[in-house]
Curated annotation (Swiss-Prot):
Entries under Gene3D superfamilies matching the protein: Creatinase/methionine aminopeptidase superfamily (3.90.230.10), Winged helix-like DNA-binding domain superfamily/Winged helix DNA-binding domain (1.10.10.10)
GO biological process, one term: proteolysis
Family: Belongs to the peptidase M24A family. Methionine aminopeptidase archaeal type 2 subfamily.
Cofactor: Co(2+); Zn(2+); Mn(2+); Fe(2+)
Binding site for a divalent metal cation 2: 93, 153, 187, 280
Lineage top rank: taxon: Archaea
Pfam families: Peptidase_M24
Functional description taken from the UniProt entry: Removes the N-terminal methionine from nascent proteins. The N-terminal methionine is often cleaved when the second residue in the primary sequence is small and uncharged (Met-Ala-, Cys, Gly, Pro, Ser, Thr, or Val).
UniProt keyword Membrane present: no
Cofactor note: Binds 2 divalent metal cations per subunit. Has a high-affinity and a low affinity metal-binding site. The true nature of the physiological cofactor is under debate. The enzyme is active with cobalt, zinc, manganese or divalent iron ions. Most likely, methionine aminopeptidases function as mononuclear Fe(2+)-metalloproteases under physiological conditions, and the catalytically relevant metal-binding site has been assigned to the histidine-containing high-affinity site.
Temperature-related activity annotation: Optimum temperature is about 90 degrees Celsius.
Name of the molecule in the record: Methionine aminopeptidase
Binding site for a divalent metal cation 1: 82, 93, 280
Amino acid sequence: MDTEKLMKAGEIAKKVREKAIKLARPGMLLLELAESIEKMIMELGGKPAFPVNLSINEIAAHYTPYKGDTTVLKEGDYLKIDVGVHIDGFIADTAVTVRVGMEEDELMEAAKEALNAAISVARAGVEIKELGKAIENEIRKRGFKPIVNLSGHKIERYKLHAGISIPNIYRPHDNYVLKEGDVFAIEPFATIGAGQVIEVPPTLIYMYVRDVPVRVAQARFLLAKIKREYGTLPFAYRWLQNDMPEGQLKLALKTLEKAGAIYGYPVLKEIRNGIVAQFEHTIIVEKDSVIVTTE
C-alpha cells in the first residue's frame, strides 16, 4: 500500500467533487459536466478510476453520458456525482448528491449522516456488519429506506471492487473484520422508494475481464485498446465513441461481452422509481480509527 498516492488521489477526488457541485446548474448538459469532471482529474495529475457516474433522481448508479447525450439538468433534480481518481492504480472513490438549484433536504441528509455514522464506528477489529447496522439505523430513523442491494466495497491497487462489501443494512453473516491498512469505499444509498435497485438499459460502463479469441476484427482491435488503456478499471462507452462508427462499436462491445472478455454494468434504477441519494468516502483503516482520504 502506498499511503502517499492514496492520499493524493483522495485530495484530487475531493477537489473535483467540490468543483462539480458548483458546476451542476439547471440547464447544463450532463455530457458537459462529465467531460469537465474527467478533464479536471487529469489536469490535477490523476486519472479517472472509472467514468464519472452522474445519476439523476430514481437512477441510483452507473449512468455516465455518451457523446450525443442531450440530457439536461433541471431544477430540483437529485444528481448523484460519483467520482473515482487513481494515481498509479491507488484509488479514491467519493460521491455526493446535489439537488440542482436547490438546498439539501432530509433524504440527502439521511445518506450523508449514514456515511458519517459508518465512518465513526470503523477501525481495525470491527466487523463489517457493524458498519451496515450504523448505516441502516441512521437512514431508517429518518423515515427512509437503505438500498439493500447496493454496497460499499474494499479497494485494492487497480481493483475498484476487491471482493468484500459493506452493505447498507445489518446482515448477521457479514463478519469480515476490518484490518489495519484495509482501504474501503463506504457509500450509503437512501431512498423514498422500496429500497432496491434493478438493472435497466442502457449499458454505458464496462470493464475488461480477460483475453478471449474473437473473430470480429473490430472486437479484437477494441479489446487490445481496452486492455492497454484501462487495464482492470472500468471504462465508458463514451471513451470509445471516436474509435469506430456507432454500429461497429456496439457490435464489437456486444461480441466481447458475450464472449466474457468484458463485463457490462447496466444502469441501476430504484425498483419503484423512488428518488435516491448517495454519499461516499474512501477510508484507510487504522488501529483505533480511520483516515478519510477524500475529506
